[in-house]
Amino acid sequence: MSDIEKVVMRTRTIEKLLRTQYHAEGKGLHQLITSCEERLPRDVVAKLRFIATVRNKVVHEEDYKLDDRKGFLAACDACEKELTPRSSR
């Protein structure tokens, strides 16, 4: 799976969690985060911002390379775990 595919798939999951569990609103991931950031821990917001920035660069910048794939995936894992309701874990 290419970096673009992996990034898009992971961010779609996070977007869905933000919309369904936190009633986030907006077009992009940054807007979704902004709409519900008061209800999220600061460390999660920081990770989400990192994820959103990487996603935008991967999708919109032709020459962007995902240098820290492991770090990106770890941030996604941490955010998905934090955003998933405890009863669903």
Where are these regions (language model features)?
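Amphipathic alpha-helical interface elements
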Residues: M1-T53, H60-R89
